[in-house]
Amino acid sequence: MDPPSLLSLALLLLAAAAAAAFVLFPRRRSPEKKPSSGNPGSLSELIKNGHRILDWMVEILAASPTNTVATYMGVVTANPANVEHMLKTKFENYPKGDRFVTLLEDFLGRGIFNSDGDHWKLQRKTASLEFNTKTIRTFVMENVRVSVVDRLIPIFARAAASGETIDLQETLERFAFDNVCKVSFNEDTGRLSGDDTMEGREFARAFEQASELIVGRYKHPFLLSWKLMRFFNIGDERRLKEKIATVHRFATSVIRRRKSAASLGDDLLSRFIAEADYPDEFLRDIIISFVLAGRDTTSATLTWFFWLASTRPEVLARVEAEVNAVRRKNGTCAGVMFTLEEVREMDFLHAALSEALRLYPPVPLQTRACHESDEFPDGTKVRPGTTVMYNSYAMGRMKSIWGEDYAEFRPERWLDKGGGFQPRSPFRFPVFHAGPRMCLGKEMAYIQMKAVAASVVERFEVVVMDKEKVREKDYTMILRVKGGLPVRLKEKSVAAG
């Protein structure tokens, strides 16, 4: 595009932004009064604290008597009663909303994580039946076994032998991507092993880039700006279109091969195909949604877990003791993959991972749109069209929810007097959502994380470089460790047993 056209577009964007500001801001502000400069929810404060948005929101929510504030982003809450109201009591009044759906629709279509109403109910019902079968759990465990025993552990063993420093986060991300693709549509993308095909490599790279670019839309304060860029096919929107085309092409190819196959497998795509004659686009949206949901969530949690545990060596010692106790009880040796039943016996490890999730939830903020006028249990009045957010990151740091030691990494808070895992209300710990939209993959996520963590802790000492250093947060679509997590691995003698 030539310079005059770019200048015209820039002026058009500015005009559109000004017009949108006039229309949109009144709909998002508090129904009682507009946040003014100097108030915690004001636009100036938001801009000033943009580099530390999550921790700033913790501060203003903790300072609010109801743990709820009105900002230029909408109404934000860390109040469990309000969360239950949104996600359960008045579930139908708080859909994802058109703004959220529109932002992600090019990438996710109307998949289960990007739809409301009857379309969502159909996918949810079908997916719920599949996730609760013994067959899918067995399939997940077998894939974890192959990925851990045949790929992840050998990589760690080579790193231990050479003494090299590796980025634990990056390695776990490659592991997680391979695993979620295998479970979703039974394709080996080979990211961890390096045996990826050209098609698989292009898909993986395009998926990662599309995920990052789609998040960029959230940085545009007004819908019109990125929509105009998409209309003119320029900048990030042009790149996004190209990456989405690559992802969709790969997914459609897999779907058509699977439909024409003589027999179907136990992966999620095969089970959906066996369920009914769904259109290719419907299936594509579903599997892309599942890959997005599982791609970085488990790897991010495991990364945060290993960093947090490095600050409390006694936690890792207790995890190792629990793993050894499970081995003795079941008569299995180190190096043999744990069974599903063995993984479920690891209550302290379950608690330690839950504690990492409390402090560093993969998705810190979740948004909803108010459909009809409403009032939260804490008295906050919400207008139709208002963006409403519940802040899982802040809720994990509320003294009112977790007590005086809320800032500490203390897995023991999740155990009962007998040492068994004690779940908390999902409205106090909404990391896996709650109500009708409760995450279907919750058990699957815990199974994978526990299997990986137990296998690594049993065989290696994970030495985090600069473990005393406070890790910065990288928050795009998932809350990750900024710059990765450099570690060195030392193989334990027990590994040979």
Curated annotation (Swiss-Prot):
Tissue expression per record: Mainly expressed in roots and, at low levels, in leaves, fruits and stems.
Entry's EC annotation: 1.14.14.-
GO molecular function, one term: iron ion binding
Membrane topology term: Single-pass membrane protein
GO BP, sorted A to Z: cholesterol metabolic process; saponin biosynthetic process; steroid biosynthetic process
Listed Pfam families: p450
One term under GO cellular component: membrane
Record key words, sorted: Cholesterol metabolism, Heme, Iron, Lipid biosynthesis, Lipid metabolism, Membrane, Metal-binding, Monooxygenase, Oxidoreductase, Steroid biosynthesis, Steroid metabolism, Sterol metabolism, Transmembrane, Transmembrane helix
Matching SUPFAM superfamilies: Cytochrome P450
Domain of life per record: Eukaryota
InterPro entries xrefs: Cyt_P450, Cyt_P450_CS, Cyt_P450_E_grp-I, Cyt_P450_sf
Cellular compartments annotated: Membrane
Binding site for heme: C439
Pathway(s) this gene product operates in, as recorded in its UniProt entry: Steroid metabolism; cholesterol metabolism
Technological use: The coexpression of CYP90G4 and CYP94D108 in the yeast strain RH6829, which was engineered to accumulate cholesterol, leads to the production of diosgenin, the main precursor for the industrial production of steroid hormones.
Transmembrane segments: 6-26
Family: Belongs to the cytochrome P450 family.
UniProt function note: Involved in the biosynthesis of spiroketal steroid and saponin natural products from cholesterol such as diosgenin and analogs (e.g. furostanol and spirostanol), plant defense compounds used as main precursors for the industrial production of steroid hormones. During the 5,6-spiroketalization of cholesterol, may catalyze the 27-monohydroxylation of furostanol-type steroid to an intermediate product that undergoes a stereospecific formation of the terminal heterocycle to yield diosgenin.
Protein name as catalogued: Cytochrome P450 CYP94D108
Originating species: Paris polyphylla (Daiswa polyphylla)
Taxonomic path: Eukaryota, Viridiplantae, Streptophyta, Embryophyta, Tracheophyta
